[in-house]
Amino acid sequence: MMSLEMFHEQILKGKNLQEVYELIEDFKIEMIFLKVQIEQKNILKLTLPPEDMVSKIKNYRFYIEDSYRYIESLNGEVNWAEEDAFTQNFQKSIPFIEKIDYSENDKNLCEILFDEDSVRITQNKETVPSIDKEFFLNALSELHMGEWREVYTANDYGLDSLEGLSWKIKVYFKNDMDTVLFTGTDAYPYNYKTFKQLIQG
């Protein structure tokens, strides 16, 4: 895939507003296609997402962000799609997270508390060594959880429920961002395993 600079010069430059918005929609479709490919495999076996596919998703994300900046330079304002506005707000609010609750099969397995300089994780009522807050927040930012859907089920992918694992992630903020709840049964966001790896150390 081309660099951001090449994309801006060779693809973006000279396009009108309508063309740029259409380009953004095309990139979002490509991102969704890649994510769904990973998520379908995760239903059968939860694994870390392949690096090459993650890299492509990141590139499409960069193209979308640059396209929105280009719209702003042309128009002075951006007509955000609802899901994109939520994604932006979630990403900007990551430094203001105060707690994350994570559970599987309705058991409170993990509570993550954000102190001034560190993150305290309690798993099954046992506290693990604290983690540097800046490191943890940067890792959360890389997950782009604001792009996740609110609910994931096997039915989303044309499969019957396997009656397996249900999970829940609840994110609390100390700014004006509302509490966000993600849930799933037998299905997961494409980088869910990366999230689990982060909180398990």
Regions found by a protein language model. Give the residues of each.
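Short, charge/polar-rich alpha-helical segments
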Residues: 1-30
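Short, solvent-exposed coil/turn linker segments
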Residues: 8-11, 112-113, 144-147
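Secondary-structure edge/capping motif, primarily at the C-terminal ends of alpha-helices
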Residues: 11, 31-34, 38-45
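Short, well-ordered, aromatic-rich surface patches in folded extracellular/luminal domains
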Residues: 41-106, 117, 124-135, 140-201
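Conserved beta-hairpin
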Residues: 110-115, 119
